[in-house]
């Protein structure tokens, strides 16, 4: 976020409507996943001035998982990168900052799902998520999701 803020503020980046952050255990489920997320931002998040748009999880307390889209608004980017800057390393940053993100404006994104420490996922489970409209999945620790996605869409 700091990189995006610095380059946006210096006008070395064009204005971004949002920034997607995701970890190595996140996997797109459909070919045009980034377009689908962009459309969802435009239709659901932007009209409500949402700053964090991702999978709502309930454990250990309600929060939006950090594999999410964040507003490209310069004031928000300044807040998250310069005023917040970091947090207690004994907790996940998304959970630790949940109250702050809620105050800034968060929303569950129905196209992103997150699982906590899920070891594997069956093809039927993956198909069910795809069928329900999920385009980005986070939290499966083995290669079952990426292998299924490659098999379906890469060949």
Which residues make up each language-model segment?
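Hydrophobic helix-cap positions at the C-terminus of alpha-helices
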Residues: 8-10, 40, 44
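Active-site-proximal specificity loops/subdomain of glycosyltransferases
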Residues: 1-17
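Short beta-strand-to-loop acidic/aromatic patch adjacent to the donor-nucleotide binding site
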Residues: 14-27
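Catalytic core and acceptor-binding pocket of nucleotide-sugar-dependent glycosyltransferases
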Residues: 28-32, 42-155
């Amino acid at each position: 976020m700091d990189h995006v803020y610095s380059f946006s503020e210096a006008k070395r980046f064009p204005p971004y409507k949002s920034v997607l952050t995701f970890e190595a255990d996140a996997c797109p489920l459909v070919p045009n996943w980034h377009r689908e997320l962009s459309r969802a931002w435009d239709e659901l998040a932007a009209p409500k001035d949402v700053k964090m748009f991702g999978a709502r999880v309930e454990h250990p307390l309600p929060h939006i998982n950090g594999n999410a889209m964040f507003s490209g608004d310069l004031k928000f980017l300044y807040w998250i990168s310069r005023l917040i800057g970091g947090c207690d390393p004994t907790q996940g940053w998304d959970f630790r900052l949940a109250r702050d993100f809620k105050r800034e404006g968060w929303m569950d994104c129905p196209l992103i799902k997150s699982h906590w420490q899920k070891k594997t996922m069956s093809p039927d489970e993956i198909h069910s998520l795809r069928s329900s409209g999920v385009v980005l999945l986070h939290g499966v620790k083995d290669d079952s999701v990426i292998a299924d996605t490659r098999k379906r869409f890469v060949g």
